[in-house]
Amino acid sequence: MAGHSKWANTKHRKAAQDAKRGKIFTKIIRELVTAARLGGGDPGSNPRLRAAIDKALSNNMTRDTLNRAIARGVGGDEDANMETIIYEGYGPGGTAVMVECLSDNRNRTVSEVRHAFTKTGGNLGTDGSVSYLFTKKGVISYAPGLDEDAVMDAALEAGADDVVTYDDGAIDVFTPWETFGNVKDALDAAGLKAESAEVSMIPSTKADMDAETAPKLMRLIDMLEDCDDVQEVYHNGEISDEVAELL
């Protein structure tokens, strides 16, 4: 598929924000603890835990830190009253936005999320208002330089749904989220080292952002990611290379 890897661009932008790395680690640890508490400490039988482990490793978390978080979840933890909450809304330019949270206080969390939407010209929606536009999938991303045919053959044989190659040579492998770990293992075994790997919500449609709405969308994402309870922010905003250069 022709095009430029907007997915990769977003990931690179987030990865470059080193000042947020401590907060990112805190959120990943919270997800590891919760996933282990709810589904057990074996990633082979706990897809949510496997996804959290791959995300932790993609963000260069040490195995010691990762294993301690899993042990906390399996052994019972002070975060035992955490629950997953999904908020849906509309951002600048009519973008569809989903906000995944882990919280022990729904009132606090919804207040912070609503504030971010309101400050950037968006509004919080009701359950189901935008979720139908997204599909939960595994995404395994490769930097430019790999053999496209080798990645495609290994991925499809392992059960991937789709392989997308971009103009810059970057490759994204999309998988059913339930079998994400198995596909990742098969690609690793084939000697294909991923740049990042995680379970995400992939939009079925895109909303084009212009020079006016793109900065507002970026501000909304930043405000949401700054909330301690927010784990992930998904959206269908599409920012062209020309507009991105102006940000």
Curated annotation (Swiss-Prot):
One of its GO terms (molecular function) is DNA binding. Keywords: Cytoplasm, DNA-binding, Transcription, Transcription regulation. Transmembrane segments: none annotated. SUPFAM superfamilies: YebC-like. The keyword Nucleus does not apply. Its main location: cytoplasm. The keyword Nucleotide-binding does not apply. One of its GO terms (cellular component) is cytosol. Belongs to the TACO1 family. This is Probable transcriptional regulatory protein PC1_1817. It comes from Pectobacterium carotovorum subsp. carotovorum (strain PC1).
